[in-house]
Design a protein with these regions (language model features):
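Acetyl-CoA-dependent GNAT
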Residues: 4, 9, 13-91, 96-97, ...
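Residue-level detector of alpha-helical recognition elements and their boundaries
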Residues: 37, 65, 85, 105, ...
């Protein structure tokens, strides 16, 4: 996918150099919400090597939002899920404190939606936690519909589940 500049933020595919910055943003979010518990992405084995994980298969993608000075502001991706057919999971949408007021989450989500559609997926699935209330509001504004907890949930500590047709 080509780079896409939206105001002063560029959304682009992940590089290996982004890995430590993304891992720090993700861990910081879990620490701020006191969710450093098993059953969350905080303990995902690929967290320090997201570039390798998302580039391992052609129907995955991961994107970073970068400010004018090159600072990584946020991240979001998608990968296959066994929860539903022809469905990708929107994964690891996290923002730095500086990005939370710039609508970066919306921009990343929309980029991921288009990339998942381009990869042939028909639906996006999200699992999140009720403590991530700003993310829940964003998902609902983007048209995701809350569903009951499906079978095969990857992160057992999550308590909110959503679907959106692409």
């Amino acid at each position: 996918m080509e780079q896409q500049t939206l105001s002063s933020v560029t959304i682009r595919p992940i590089t290996a150099a982004d890995d430590p910055f993304i891992a720090k943003i993700i861990r910081t979010n879990f620490e701020q919400y006191h969710l450093t518990i098993p059953g969350t992405a905080y303990f995902d084995p690929e967290l320090d090597h997201l570039r390798a994980f998302y580039s391992a298969k052609p129907d995955r993608g991961y994107f970073v939002a970068v400010g004018e000075n090159g600072t990584v502001l946020g991240c979001c991706g998608f990968a296959e899920t066994a929860v539903f057919d022809r469905c990708a999971e929107l994964q690891k949408l996290y923002l730095s404190a500086a990005a939370k007021v710039k609508r970066v989450g919306r921009r990343l989500s929309e980029t991921v939606e288009q990339a998942a559609r381009d990869a042939g997926y028909e639906t996006l699935y999200i699992e999140t936690h009720s403590k991530f209330d700003a993310a829940i509001r964003l998902y609902e504004k983007l048209g995701f519909q809350q569903i009951d907890k499906p079978q095969g949930v990857q992160h057992g500590a999550m308590d909110h589940f959503y679907l959106k047709s692409l």
